[in-house]
Amino acid sequence: VTTKKWVQNPVYSAGSEKKDTDLLLIIDTSGSMGAITDPKSNLHQAVLAAYGIIKYFENRKNQIALLGFSDRITANVDWTKDYDSIREKLLLNGGGGTSFPIARIQSIIESSTNPLVTVIITDGEIQNTNQTIDYFKEYLTNGNKLFIFLQDRKSTIEHYKTLTNYGAKVLKTLTANEMRDSVLNEVI
């Protein structure tokens, strides 16, 4: 009778785990997104989707940053594990125009040391498209994930075709479930 001596596989040793992935939520809060209290509005659906995505990252104890925008920055929360603060900052009504804050987005992304999942939910065309696409190409080549959800039936994903070639997911979606499931199916 012999007994097999088990050797611990170094791949499963403590300290060699994959780095945590953090979440950057970017939500359009312009007037065209509607009122958060109207279940049929794009903003209501965006916030519901965000809550579902936040829950996943909260369960994993990962950091989250939030940026709400219209013609100005309406919510700005740097990397945190204070998930209730993020949820609270999401509860605002839409107002104003749509101006995509790429400089602030770059600043938030560059302040993270972990791989990232960035989720952008909007019903309009992203302004300064060329600058945005160039930045997110580099972002994607660094192993990060990008989801852009267009909530307007008239929006076109053609502007973002280049980003899909780099691995971004660009989808026309109208419901919270579609947005949440699209993200979670990729990150789980």
Please place each PLM-identified region on the residue numbering:
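Basic/hydrophobic alpha-helical interface regions
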Residues: 16, 31, 83-84, 109-110, ...
